[in-house]
Design a protein with these regions (language model features):
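Acidic (Asp/Glu-rich) sequence patches and key acidic residues
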Residues: 1-279, 306-321
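Short, conserved charged micro-motifs
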Residues: 11-21, 331-339, 402-403
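Short secondary-structure junctions
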Residues: 25-37, 295-304, 342-357
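Secretory pathway targeting signatures of secreted, lumenal, and periplasmic proteins
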Residues: 285-340
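Signature of long, low-cysteine stretches enriched in small and polar/charged residues
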Residues: 338-396, 400, 420-421
């Protein structure tokens, strides 16, 4: 059973609350997002507080706020940070604040008891459950968002946003060495701003979010690289004895074009596996379709019409193939191929998980004379799966890339549909 904090309150003016939250976010260096039905306060990577709001009836009706957050598996330090944020909001903006905290920390503020009586027992049960499920010939995921990419599977390992762990590593630390697991599992285990929290925030971004691409490639790459570098340097300053992932730190400094600040004499953190799921191939989802692509490929959505559009994956830093995905649903029944691929070469067909796919390649005709010295080729693929027809087109500039593209299409999978309707 996860550890949660539930809260509710009232405010007289939603607009004043939004204005106040924007000012507070700027002062405290927090991220706050707003939408029609509520707001979200982000306290750390993957750690946030959600609030929904609703106007009460009557001319003088106030706004009722309700919300909650799951503080596992982020850790007792995150739980404390949520309580302190509620304290701040209760003094500043919220009226009639009510908090339900089953750990009792809201009332007694005993951090040691919170950690020893609630988070460590939760972690003990969690590790026991993981080891009961984790088989030597299979891979297990925990706390992983279903609608994002799927990391490469390694038998006998656990995939989490905080890193990959082997069954043996967990077994060796089960019981008396549980604290070692806590230091790596919990992103924010200890109270306040501390070196371990900064390091683990960096590790989470390195494992799950970082493309290991140059900061010049995109704004997203620059923000991710610099967040990691700054967090590791903060950790080093707060506790020079804390082991850090120095090899990856220096690599990210090179990708960001800056000189390393952490000295070479700093202790090196030892990991079982190379940090960064995106350093390897990953399974990228487009609705129910899953295609194995290089982890460095970045995704962009291009809207078309009302609610339609296409998704594109590629690496802007290199002359990589450009993968473009789109899809349409048949409201009257099963989807069928639209294209017989006439004029395509090396046409292949494949059936998998109830889906039917076919693809082939052709040279792209260049209209402008100046482009004709730089030939392009294209692989076109259709996948009919239940009521949906997926179109995959791959543009590439080197003939030798065709075999790799075909190999990836042969390894496509069909999973659960991510968007219903």
């Amino acid at each position: 059973m996860n550890i949660e904090i539930i809260y509710r309150a009232r405010v007289r003016s939603r607009d004043n609350l939004v204005k106040s939250m924007k000012n507070m976010a700027s002062l405290l260096d927090l991220r706050v997002g707003f939408w029609e039905q509520g707001m979200r306060i982000v306290l750390c990577p993957g750690g946030y507080m959600d609030f929904g709001w609703q106007k009460e009836k009557g001319l003088l009706g106030q706004w009722r706020l309700t919300g909650g957050c799951d503080t596992t598996p982020l850790g007792a330090g995150f739980h404390k940070a949520v309580v302190e944020m509620l304290d701040l909001l209760g003094k500043k903006d919220l009226r009639e604040l009510e908090v339900r905290d089953d750990t009792g920390y809201w009332e007694d503020r005993d951090f040691e008891r919170l950690q020893k009586e609630h988070f460590y027992p939760w972690l003990t049960r969690e590790v026991d459950d993981i080891l009961n499920q984790l088989e030597d010939n299979a891979c297990l995921q925990r706390y992983w968002m279903e609608d994002q990419y799927q990391p490469q599977e390694i038998p006998g390992t656990l995939i989490t946003p905080m890193g990959r762990f082997s069954k043996k590593w967990l077994q060796e630390r089960q019981g008396d060495r549980l604290e070692e697991i806590a230091h790596r599992f919990f992103l924010w285990e200890q109270p306040g701003d501390n070196a371990l929290c900064f390091r683990n925030c960096a590790l989470k971004r390195m494992w799950e979010d970082c493309y290991y691409a140059t900061s010049a490639r995109s704004k997203e790459d620059a923000q991710t690289n610099r967040y990691i570098i700054n967090a590791l340097e903060e950790a080093s300053e707060l506790d020079p004895s804390l082991p850090l992932p120095l090899e990856d730190y220096r690599l990210l400094c090179r990708l960001d074009g800056r000189e390393p600040f952490i000295p070479d004499t700093a202790p090196q953190m030892v990991e079982e596996f190379a940090i960064g799921y995106r350093k390897e191939e990953v399974m990228q989802p487009f609705d129910a379709l899953r295609v194995p692509l290089p982890g460095i490929y970045r995704y962009e959505w291009s809207p078309v019409g009302q609610g339609g559009g296409s998704g594109t994956w590629w690496d802007e830093d290199s002359d990589s193939p450009v993968w473009r995905f789109s899809g349409c649903r048949n409201p009257h029944g099963a989807a069928e191929w639209n294209n017989d691929l006439d004029g395509m070469q090396d046409v292949e067909e494949r059936e998998f998980s109830g889906a039917r796919a076919h693809w082939g390649w052709s040279e792209v005709k260049r209209r402008r004379k100046k482009d004709q010295d730089d030939p392009l080729w294209q692989v076109v693929c259709e996948v009919a799966a239940e009521d949906t027809l997926y179109l995959v087109s791959v543009l590439y500039s080197r003939p030798e890339e065709r075999q790799d593209i075909y190999d990836r299409l042969r390894r496509m999978e069909l999973g659960k549909r991510l968007v219903e309707g």
